[in-house]
A protein has these predicted regions:
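Structural alpha/beta surface segment adjacent to cysteine/selenocysteine redox centers
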Residues: 11-13, 19-96
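C-terminal cap of thioredoxin/glutaredoxin-like
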Residues: 12, 93-163
Length: 163
């Protein structure tokens, strides 16, 4: 959809502040701005560690229509899989729930092209000023750290009104 305002979220699936945003603020932001066509929301991987990279890879291997839902599940269950003795096995279970078969999961985890693509995305974001997660790029301006729906509204309402 051609929403007038774009938000890019730079996130790591192992970042607790990112999980707080997705668990506490994202649904309100989506209802108020994305579902109404005012804002386009783009996910940009910025993995902070190897487990975060693997989680990002798994999410990217799922059918793209299921991607936003998988991201939400990963954040809602972050404490379970990210701190598990075997996080990859936990990611595999989540992938299976999203329709990613065992072979598809294994080839996904072994895809150097996918890993390199995600790391290149992170490097590009870093070069453009992103230093931590979550960071939000709203119409070219960077906003590091999680924010409340009220804080997002203060930023977004004038931009939406302008367009």
């Amino acid at each position: 959809a051609d929403a007038p305002v774009t938000i890019v979220e730079y996130f790591s699936l192992t970042c607790s502040h990112c999980a707080s945003f997705h668990n506490d603020v994202y649904d309100d932001l989506k209802k108020k701005y994305v579902d109404t066509g005012k804002v386009k929301f783009i996910y940009s991987d910025f993995p902070l560690d190897g487990v975060g990279l693997r989680a990002a890879m798994m999410a990217r291997c799922v059918d793209e229509r299921r991607y936003p839902g998988v991201i939400q599940v990963l954040f809602k269950t972050q404490n379970n899989w990210a701190r598990a003795a075997d996080p990859i096995a936990e990611l595999k279970k989540i992938g299976q729930l999203a329709g990613l078969g065992e072979e598809a999961f294994e080839s996904c985890m072994q895809s150097e092209a996918l890993a390199n693509g995600i790391l290149a995305e992170r490097q590009k974001a870093g070069a453009s000023g992103v230093q931590s997660t979550p960071t939000f790029r709203i119409e070219g301006q960077l906003y590091p750290g999680s924010r409340s729906i009220e804080e997002f509204s203060e930023i977004l309402d004038p931009l939406v009104a302008k367009n």
